[in-house]
Regions:
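Acceptor/aglycone-binding surface of glycosyltransferases and processive sugar-polymer synthases
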Residues: 1-74, 101-111, 115-118, 122, ...
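Catalytic donor-sugar/metal-binding loop of nucleotide-sugar-dependent glycosyltransferases
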Residues: 48-49, 71-72, 82-99
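Cell-envelope/extracellular polymer assembly enzymes that use nucleotide-activated donors
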Residues: 79
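Negatively charged linear elements and acidic catalytic determinants
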Residues: 123-127
Length: 139
């Protein structure tokens, strides 16, 4: 199912193109980090599950485009997904095929990966609980 069809079918706010929705991938350190972030989000959102929190392939409805366009604190990161889930935003996932990187190098070397995970965990477990919510946001 494609992302547009899923958004129309479910009336959700965000559709994530997931690498792991229906397909298993070989376990590596990146996947372990992604799963740890998935569990952190589940803990802080009352069990809401997003299987591929680090996927950058996302489709936003008009309301979400407006929110991301006007709020500088919205970034395409897992902690923002946790915040949005706690605000009542509906997020769905569909399986997509993504190819491995064929050129360039990731900025997430070992040191940067540790730093990234620390920032995400701090934000998900601490900062999101004190973050000011906009009018209409839940919780």
């Amino acid at each position: 199912m494609d992302m547009i069809t899923e958004m129309e079918r479910t009336s959700c706010d965000i559709v994530i193109g997931s690498r792991f929705k229906t397909q298993r991938k070989p376990v590596n350190s990146r996947m372990i980090g992604s799963q740890l972030l998935t569990y952190a989000i589940m803990i802080t959102t009352g069990g809401k599950y997003i299987g591929d929190v680090t996927s950058g392939m996302r489709l936003f409805n008009k309301r979400m485009i407006k929110r991301f366009g006007y709020d500088i604190n919205y970034s395409p990161e897992p902690d923002t997904l946790a915040y949005l889930l706690n605000c009542g935003v509906k997020i769905e996932e569909v399986q997509v095929e993504m190819h491995e990187r064929i050129a360039g190098t990731s900025y997430l070397d070992f040191k940067n990966s540790i730093w990234y995970m620390m920032k995400m965990f701090f934000s998900i477990f601490i900062f999101q609980w004190v973050r000011k919510r906009e009018k209409g946001d839940k919780k």
